[in-house]
């Protein structure tokens, strides 16, 4: 909930962090090196004003809705999706969703494959023919793919958001059913 590229770092007074880059501070422009004081020492160049404003808006939205409400809706959407796709012939769902942690928390991400179809092909069909955005490939997790034996195929990842709807979940499940029937 907010743009990428903006974050925060809490650092104790004794931490000796070296700047990643240096440049104008906007306050002490004639200094050749970054000032020693934190946070200015780590803030080279122009701050990401739009990103900071977006981050603030995202935090305000989280506070308004509540993390528990967001999690509950995302979990409900994920469970509805799983219930619809688990019986599709040829579909493989990765992960053990029956063994949730004691607190029941599980991120609202489901990775699948359809038989031996390339994950990029499935993801392209979902986007181009159904308007459904997914992410295909290795997802920066080569060891996981080695474990599942999907190094060459990859996986199609569905990520559910508080702003998704049950209708969208139904459409995604129906699209997978149709794609599985095409192979």
Predicted regions, residues:
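Pyridoxal 5′-phosphate
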Residues: 1-183
């Amino acid at each position: 909930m907010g743009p990428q590229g903006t974050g925060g770092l809490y650092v104790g007074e004794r931490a000796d962090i070296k700047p990643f880059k240096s440049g104008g501070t906007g306050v002490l422009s004639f200094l050749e090196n970054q000032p020693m004081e934190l946070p200015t020492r780590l803030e080279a160049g122009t701050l990401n004003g739009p990103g900071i404003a977006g981050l603030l808006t995202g935090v305000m939205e989280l506070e308004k809705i509540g993390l528990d409400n967001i999690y509950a809706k995302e979990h409900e959407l994920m469970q509805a999706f799983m219930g619809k796709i688990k019986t599709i012939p040829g579909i493989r769902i990765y992960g053990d969703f029956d063994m949730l942690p004691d607190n029941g928390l599980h991120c609202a991400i489901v990775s699948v494959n359809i038989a031996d179809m390339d994950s990029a092909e499935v993801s392209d069909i979902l986007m181009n023919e159904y308007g459904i955005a997914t992410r295909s490939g290795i997802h920066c997790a080569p060891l996981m793919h080695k474990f599942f034996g999907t190094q060459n195929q990859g996986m199609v990842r569905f990520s559910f958001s508080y702003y998704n709807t049950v209708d969208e979940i139904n459409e995604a499940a129906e699209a997978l059913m149709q794609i599985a029937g095409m192979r």
